[in-house]
Design a protein with these regions (language model features):
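Conserved AMP-binding/adenylate-forming core of the ANL superfamily
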Residues: 64, 82-137, 154, 158-159, ...
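Conserved pre-ATP/AMP-binding loop-to-beta segment of ANL
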Residues: 78-80, 203-206, 211, 215-248, ...
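Structural core segment of the AMP-binding/adenylate-forming
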Residues: 137, 141-225, 344
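AMP-binding/adenylate-forming catalytic core of the ANL superfamily
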Residues: 149-174, 189, 333, 340, ...
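AMP-binding/adenylate-forming catalytic domain of the ANL superfamily
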Residues: 201-207, 542, 574-599, 611-634
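Conserved AMP-binding/adenylation subdomain of ANL enzymes
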Residues: 267-285, 295-339, 352-358
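Gly/Ser/Thr-rich phosphate-binding loop
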Residues: 310, 338-342, 351-418, 432, ...
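Conserved ATP/PPi-binding loop(s) of AMP-dependent carboxylate-activating enzymes
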Residues: 426-430, 441-476, 515, 612-613
Length: 634
């Protein structure tokens, strides 16, 4: 690491943080030297025509080269690059860097043969199979821009993304497999194309043995057949500021936003993160138990581990029921995983089905050094459960689709800091996190406000929203000039630790008091009978809003629901005060969630308020909403 700024009595973290804060160009120039450029950047930071900071604008490189070819050139071609483990099909497969490079080069050739070139968009609608990662890397190889959509997403949502991205081709598979259910993808893709005003020229279909798709001879291509005839394609040089991908994230209103990621800043930031945040050596085994359709899958299944020369794991399964709550621990044991990264909801599911950690005891986790969590607030009961059962450090960190890597975390490769439950620790070097009030003034420690990032944002953060720069300006930059507004509320404590209390929308107003539902969830979720919970603000004529709790019990727990409600009401009252007006907690079998594990609080609130609502496209199981309606009718 660097020791660039400040006196000798400063910690390693403080030195690194201040170097990045005070001399961002010098700091990021040093980090950029850790990747293999075709032409090294002479300019480190420059504003574009919209006044947005762009990193390494004259650097020339290729992300697929960094992830694959570079390691082969360095004599690491026989090292394991990717392990595919699929409990839903019983398949397991390992790819070396050379094998992965050769297959990606041929898929790039297969795309090129259909006219796909630099700057073209390609929609990737795939299950969690190796070909999904290969498709992404093949696009990167050509300088084409991939837009990955969760496999199985509803046709109308896929259609909206097709219309916005205007892809030349779509890459899909015949089906996905959810636990034991086969979901044919082809009818969903056909319907999306039919509904979209934009028509892609070709659709590549990867035929899986579990289900064969019928092809439309005019438009569809058999992936395996095209691959067998394809010639390998070399890496196309691109500018650091050329887009690598578009990833759609749900907007609070209207159509989804296409977050644009550039090539150079992304590669530099991810390479830095693997050592600074995750402390993984080259050749280490990194497992992000996520999906390639989500930003964590983009950054930490596909790009960062491969750029860093690690082994990455692509897991086609779930934390539970594939076949049991020991799935995560089996994978960690079998492949000697160094670091595991998933969302708190995955561990809550494991805890619910195996509260005593019986399955975990069957596996050897001696190789596992750290467990990282992100994607939603890590509630202290989940943190404590995972820590006590695994005896491993559990590290919460906070970031967004928009940034592509962590904004705040425990930088284990620079300096491991003491963990504070409920906090994602401190800002990562490169980010300046400030808490602002409604007027844009910084607030005192321990005071809640808008979590904002002072510009310039570090490399990898979005420079715009795809074909809608106004939306980028109004959604993120215009509220407080000179800052990027994250949309989250939270506070910094007296030690500079960041506490994210949830989306600004999750702050409720009870009789003029602004209260965080996240804080209430922390208290409710701390009850020994409860596996997970959600608190939403519902309309009240007298007080404006009142909090309402929904709780899921741990498996096997039997309680008197009224008595439990009384205990929870008492708990919130004693810890927040009567001002919270927390009076009701309803027991449900499960909470409605997105496929990436976020609880759909807004939809729950709309149902509770009797409002019209649309079923979110990102929902994992729409029938979970009926459950909420049912308990509210009681």
């Amino acid at each position: 690491m660097s020791g660039h700024t400040g006196g000798s009595n400063m910690s390693s973290y403080e030195k690194e943080y201040l170097w990045a804060k005070n001399e961002p160009e010098s700091f990021w120039r040093a980090q950029a030297e850790n990747i293999d450029w075709f032409e090294s950047p002479k300019t480190i930071l420059k504003s574009d025509e919209n006044g947005i900071e762009r990193w390494f604008p004259d650097g020339v490189m290729n992300t697929s080269w960094l992830a694959l070819d570079y390691h082969c050139e360095q004599g690491r071609g026989d090292n394991t690059a990717l392990i595919y483990d699929s409990p839903v099909t019983g398949n397991k497969k390992t790819y070396t860097y050379r094998e992965l490079r050769d297959q990606v080069a041929k898929i790039a050739g297969m795309l090129s043969a259909q006219g796909v070139e630099k700057g073209d968009r390609v929609v990737v609608y795939m299950p969690m199979i190796p070909e999904a990662a290969m498709a992404m890397l093949a696009c990167a190889r050509l300088g084409a821009i991939h837009s990955v959509v969760f496999g199985g997403f509803a046709p109308n949502e896929l259609a909206v993304r097709i219309e916005d991205a205007e892809p030349k081709v779509i890459m899909t598979a015949s089906c996905g497999i959810e636990i034991s259910k086969i979901i044919p993808y082809k009818p969903l893709v056909d319907k999306a194309i039919m509904d979209s005003r934009w028509k892609p020229e070709k659709v590549f279909v990867f035929q899986r043995p579990e289900c064969e798709a019928e092809l439309n001879q005019e438009r569809d291509l058999d992936w395996q057949q095209e691959y067998s005839q394809a010639l390998p394609h070399a890496c196309v040089p691109v500018l650091a500021t050329d887009p690598l991908y578009i990833l759609y994230t749900s907007g609070t209103t209207g159509k989804p936003k296409g977050v644009v990621r550039d090539n150079g800043g992304h590669a530099v930031a991810l390479k830095y993160s693997m050592s600074a945040i995750y402390n993984i050596p080259q050749g280490g085994v990194f497992w992000a138990a996520s999906d390639v359709g989500w930003v964590v899958g983009h950054s930490y299944i596909v790009y960062a581990p491969l750029i860093h020369g690690c082994t990455t794991i692509l897991f086609e399964g779930k934390p539970v029921r594939t076949p049991n709550p020991g799935a995560f621990w089996r994978v960690c044991d079998e492949y000697k995983v160094d670091a595991l990264f998933s969302a708190p909801t995955a561990f809550r599911a494991i805890k619910k089905e195996d509260p005593e950690g019986e399955f975990l005891k069957q596996y050897d986790l001696s190789n596992l050094k750290t467990i990282f969590m992100a994607g939603e607030r890590l509630d202290p009961p989940t943190l404590e459960w995972v820590q006590s059962k695994t005896d491993k450090p559990v590290i919460d960190h906070w970031w967004q689709t928009e940034t592509g890597w962590a904004i705040a975390g425990n930088p284990t490769g620079i300096e491991m800091m003491p963990v504070k439950a409920g906090s994602s620790t401190k800002p990562i070097p490169g980010y300046q996190v400030e808490i602002l009030d409604e007027l844009g003034e910084p607030v005192k420690p321990n005071q809640q406000g808008f979590v904002a990032l002072k510009r310039p944002l570090p490399p990898s953060c979005l420079p715009t929203v795809w074909r809608n720069h106004d939306r980028f300006e109004t959604g993120y930059l215009s509220q407080f000039p000179g800052y990027y507004v994250s949309g989250d509320g939270g506070y910094l404590d007296e030690d500079g630790y960041l506490f994210i209390m949830g989306r600004i929308d999750d702050v409720i107003n009870v009789a003029g008091h602004r209260l965080s539902t996240g804080e209430m969830e922390e208290i409710v979720g701390g009850h020994p009978a409860i596996a997970e919970c959600a608190v939403v603000g519902i309309h009240d004529d007298l007080k404006g809003q009142l909090p309402l709790g929904f709780v899921v019990l741990k498996d096997g727990v039997k309680v008197d629901e009224l008595a439990l409600e009384g205990e929870l009401v008492g708990k919130v009252r004693s810890e927040i005060g009567a001002v919270a007006c927390f009076k009701h907690a309803l027991v449900v079998d499960r909470l409605p969630k997105t496929r990436s594990g976020k609880i759909l609080r807004r939809t729950i609130r709309q149902i509770a308020d009797g409002e019209q609502y649309t079923v979110p496209s990102t929902i994992d199981d729409p029938t979970s909403l009926n459950e909420i309606e049912r308990v509210l009718r009681r």
